[in-house]
Amino acid sequence: MNQEELSKKLLSPSKNSRLEKLGKSLTFACLSLIVIIVAMILIFVAQKGLSTFFVNGVNIFDFLFGATWNPSGKQFGALPMILGSFIVTILSALIATPFAIGAAVFMTEVSPKGAKILQPAIELLVGIPSVVYGFIGLQVVVPFVRTVFGGTGFGILSGIFVLFVMILPTVTFMTTDSLRAVPRHYREASLAMGATRWQTIWRVTLKAARSGIFTAVVFGMARAFGEALAIQMVVGNSAVIPTSLTTPAATLTSVLTMGIGNTVMGTVDNNVLWSLALVLLMMSLAFNRVIKLITKERGKKNYAR
């Protein structure tokens, strides 16, 4: 083999390099497709949602802060649904958080062997469809609330009970991962200094996993805020500002699921529902932003250590 043939052989692309280029091209194509799909969804929802204000002439201030939702009377105040969504989301997260932390501490710190029993039970909750949660809420939670607190049983309280069970697995598993990520020498150092196991759990382990727990709670809130079918079946779907936890109310998702099939595309009644969807989308993006900020702050703290 002369020098020229040897140079051509060495400089020609190998099979591995061609496969690497093919892999990079496929990865870039998949990434581009995902970005395009997300961008198209954002543009479509924004275009339809903003048509309410720029095409149909609905005042954006009246839409966001109006207390009356009556499409037949051309009154499109979304405040009752916005408040309803926030109330059920925040309260269900507040109730689910201590249960999730307790379950996570039990599985990681108290009885890791017990996780073999508890974890499959929690995983079972993840696989239950939303409609089943809603049906159970309709048959069990609503009659219970009606018997104990009076009224129809439909309302914020029933929605809180259903969402509490639905977001509990998410918050629990993410909290468990955060506790397991705490370095072992943190616990050993605390115990070596004379702290009890519960003092170590409370003052060291939970404190070190705090940002991860916050992330878990925000993830749970994002899940609760976007839930539609289950909450629609138990909340009562009354688009008025809730005066108590036991009175019927409505959320952004419940109004969307009930109204989107009863309107004509391009009409003000349809566009205003897309405006509700735009508000819902903005809130989802806000939740994602909060999660990124918490994760970024946790990364800085870990780097500082």
Segments the model singles out, each with a brief description of its role:
Residues 174-175, 197-235:
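Transmembrane alpha-helices
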Residues 123-163:
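Generic hydrophobic transmembrane alpha-helix motif, especially the helices
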Residues 91-122, 135, 143, 291-297:
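Transmembrane-helix boundary motif in ABC transporter permease subunits
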Residues 1-31, 291-305:
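Transmembrane alpha-helical segments of polytopic membrane transport and secretion proteins
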Residues 9-25, 47-92, 111, 115, ...:
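Periplasmic/extracellular loop-to-transmembrane helix junction in inner-membrane transport proteins
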Residues 231-281:
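Interhelical loop and adjacent transmembrane-helix boundary motif
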Residues 176-180, 184, 191, 261-305:
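C-terminal transmembrane helix and the adjacent membrane-cytosol boundary/short C-terminal tail
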